[in-house]
From Swiss-Prot:
It is an enzyme of class 6 (ligase). Gene3D superfamilies: HUPs, Tyrosyl-Transfer RNA Synthetase. The gene is trpS. This is Tryptophan--tRNA ligase. It is found in: Cytoplasm. Keywords: Aminoacyl-tRNA synthetase, ATP-binding, Cytoplasm, Ligase, Nucleotide-binding, Protein biosynthesis. It comes from Rickettsia prowazekii (strain Madrid E).
Length: 330
């Protein structure tokens, strides 16, 4: 029996190179080997200030990118989180067994809310509980995530264990965390110490998956390096050039040592030019297919409804099982 894999991407802003290398590309490989559930995290998206008019388009665009990148809806279950109401139902049940202190330790809330924690919405604070519900509702065996989500996954495991201990039986599967070594944490093109992010105010901090070829060339050309004239790899002392080398390696499959050796006497200009080209070679087909799919909204909606229908079968089984243990009438 195939193991179950679950993962998703928030439908906020344009998806970028970090989303592709850190998540989506890995999913393409997994769809042949696992029973995969890949969702559009639109409920998570509204924990920040997002316009109603933008959310609908963002959902469709993320779905189009999933498909354009190579996810096959006949092999995997693709759905919008908001179309499977059981996620919210299980989230409430998990809220009722999760100690408040556990949530207060979540660093991502502190990072996103900043100094205005008192003004932040409850949804942002309880975000990790909904994330736990997203995972546990499908009894996922494996959850591929970036390093920045590891704390949330550890919380998910803890919550599953609380439920199982409370009712003295394994109701919820305690998932394994899968963190890929290459491509998981692509950093900003403007600051090698910050993760590439959709929320960064500078568009030149990231390569968006729908960027034109010319814009990709511009962004890589202007990507920050440092004052040294040679290429070397050290994430602590040379984070920016190390990030560019990581991106090159992710596409070329060559070792960092070989890449450095190839460009040792050619300087940054040639390296950046070739890096832009290798990115374009890989992203252009995805961009073109995405634009084509965005013109067929009827097809995209069909995929969402089909995926949600399939997901709800699995999700409702888990929710009813948990509700029964709590004592609710099913």
């Amino acid at each position: 029996m195939k193991k179950t894999v679950l993962s998703g991407v928030q439908t906020t802003g344009a998806l970028h190179l970090g989303n592709y290398l850190g998540s989506i590309r890995n999913w393409i490989k997994m769809q042949e080997e696992y029973n995969c559930f890949f969702f559009l995290a639109d409920l998570h998206a509204i924990t920040i200030d997002i316009k109603t008019s933008e959310l609908n388009d963002a959902i469709m665009e993320v779905l189009a990118i999933y498909l354009a990148a190579g996810l096959n809806p006949d092999k995997v279950t693709i759905f919008a989180q908001s179309m499977v109401k059981e996620h919210v139902e299980l989230s409430w049940l998990l809220n009722c067994v999760t100690p408040l202190g556990w949530l207060k330790r979540m660093t991502q809330f502190k990072d996103k809310a900043g100094s205005a924690q008192c003004k932040a919405c409850l949804g942002l604070f309880a975000y990790p509980i909904l994330m736990a519900a997203d995972i546990l509702i499908y009894k996922a065996d494996i959850v591929p995530v970036g390093e920045d989500q590891k704390q949330h996954l550890e919380l998910t495991r803890d919550i599953a264990e609380v439920i199982n201990r409370r009712f003295d039986k394994e109701i919820l599967k305690v998932p394994d965390i899968l963190i890929s070594e290459t491509g998981t944490r692509i950093m900003s093109l403007r600051n090698g110490l910050k993760k590439m992010s959709k929320s960064d105010i500078s568009d030149f901090s990231r390569i968006n998956l729908k960027d034109s070829n010319d814009l990709i060339h511009q962004k890589i050309k202007k990507a920050k390096t440092d004052h040294l004239s040679f290429i070397s790899y050290n994430k602590k002392t040379r984070p920016e050039i190390s990030n560019l080398l990581d991106i090159y390696k992710s596409f070329s499959k060559e070792s960092i040592e070989k890449i450095i050796d190839n460009y040792q006497n050619q300087g940054f200009a040639k390296f950046k030019e070739d890096l832009a080209e290798i990115i374009i070679t890989n992203l252009q087909p995805i961009r073109n297919k995405c634009l084509e799919l965005m013109n067929d909204k009827e097809y995209l909606l069909k995929i969402l409804h089909k995926g949600a229908q399939k997901a709800r079968i699995r999700a409702s089984e888990t929710v009813n099982e948990v509700k029964k243990q709590f004592g609710f009438i099913i």
